């Protein structure tokens, strides 16, 4: 019998090799499903069983003649990964008082929570978004994961109140409005304009209300020290002397002074300026008294 040579030998080798090559795709396909070792309690046989996909659990392990049986997770339970658990995990995440549900409990994942609107997550707690103080504006609103981002108002802009949402606003342009500049704008208040050019010292005339409002703004928003603001407030409250004033910031004192002057405007018929000039003398503020006279009292 002649031995095969050349092309005949190559063809025979290929035919013999085919049975060994065919199972490879099947083995590769099985390997894509995770497995786990299992010992059959009845036969003592050691088996390799397929795991169950997310959202299910092992209802019955595989046997020599049957694959793994997987069952769906019951309500309020889940499995997130391929597994060989005998029961699904309970959805044990509960949202706190300052949290809301970001993702509901599902067969494939636990419940997820996030901080409610107005709060952000920090070190495991939901903290309230900070407010930017007067003189600073919001550059990035707070999110569930980040606090409010503030920055000082740049020149030409202002923010008059504490806010977690307001940006710095541009100062108004008095000239463009056809008005006179009363008080220059700062980082914490707008430019104050007026149409007032001066009014009699003690007589109320038509249109005097605009001048009275201008006087109030002019005095209340002067760039003076907190100590002097306190002295003037106390002089307006008690002309004969004053007691201690609770500690407060400049912006709060300016607003309080503005409210007090507005109260005096309503209570004293045409005598606001007289009363204010007296208080400035009592508070030992000759410079501001002189500025008020030069700005609002006509020269005779």
Curated annotation (Swiss-Prot):
Tissue expr: Detected in fetal lung, brain and liver. Detected in adult stomach, spinal cord, lymph node, trachea, spleen, colon and lung. Highly expressed in several primary tumors from colon, stomach, rectum, esophagus and in SW480 colon carcinoma cells.
SMART domains named in the record: TNFR (SM00208)
Glycan attachment points: 173
Ranges for the TNFR-Cys repeats: 31-70, 72-113, 115-150, 152-193
Keywords carried by this UniProt record: Apoptosis, Disulfide bond, Glycoprotein, Receptor, Repeat, Secreted, Signal
CDD domains, sorted: TNFRSF6B
Descriptive protein name: Tumor necrosis factor receptor superfamily member 6B
Gene it is expressed from: TNFRSF6B
PANTHER family: TUMOR NECROSIS FACTOR RECEPTOR SUPERFAMILY MEMBER, TUMOR NECROSIS FACTOR RECEPTOR SUPERFAMILY MEMBER 6B
Record keyword Secreted present: yes
């Amino acid at each position: 019998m002649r031995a095969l040579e050349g092309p005949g030998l190559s063809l025979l080798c290929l035919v013999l090799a085919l049975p060994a090559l065919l199972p490879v795709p099947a083995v590769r396909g099985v390997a894509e499903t995770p497995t786990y070792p299992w010992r059959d309690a009845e036969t003592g046989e050691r088996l390799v069983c397929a795991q169950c996909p997310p959202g299910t659990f092992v209802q019955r392990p595989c046997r020599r003649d049957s694959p793994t049986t997987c069952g769906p997770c019951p309500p309020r339970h889940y499995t997130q990964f391929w597994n060989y658990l005998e029961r699904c995990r309970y959805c044990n995440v509960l949202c706190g008082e300052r949290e809301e549900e970001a993702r509901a409990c599902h067969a494939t994942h636990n419940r997820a929570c996030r901080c409610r609107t107005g709060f952000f997550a920090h070190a495991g707690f939901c903290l309230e978004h900070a407010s930017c103080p007067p003189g600073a504006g919001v550059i990035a609103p707070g999110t569930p994961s980040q606090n409010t981002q503030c920055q000082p108002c740049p020149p030409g802009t202002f923010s008059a109140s504490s806010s977690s949402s307001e940006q710095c606003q541009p100062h108004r342009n008095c000239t463009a409005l056809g008005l006179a500049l009363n008080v220059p704008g700062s980082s914490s208040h707008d430019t104050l304009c007026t149409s007032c050019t001066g009014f009699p010292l003690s007589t109320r005339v038509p249109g005097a209300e605009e001048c009275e409002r201008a006087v109030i703004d002019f005095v209340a928003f002067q760039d003076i020290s907190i100590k002097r603001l306190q002295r003037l407030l106390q002089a307006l409250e008690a002309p004969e002397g004053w007691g201690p004033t609770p500690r407060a910031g400049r912006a709060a004192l300016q607003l309080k002074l503005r409210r007090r002057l507005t109260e005096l405007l309503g209570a004293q018929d045409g005598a606001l300026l007289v009363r204010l000039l007296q208080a400035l003398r009592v508070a030992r503020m000759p410079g501001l008294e002189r500025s008020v006279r030069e700005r609002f009292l006509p020269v005779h």
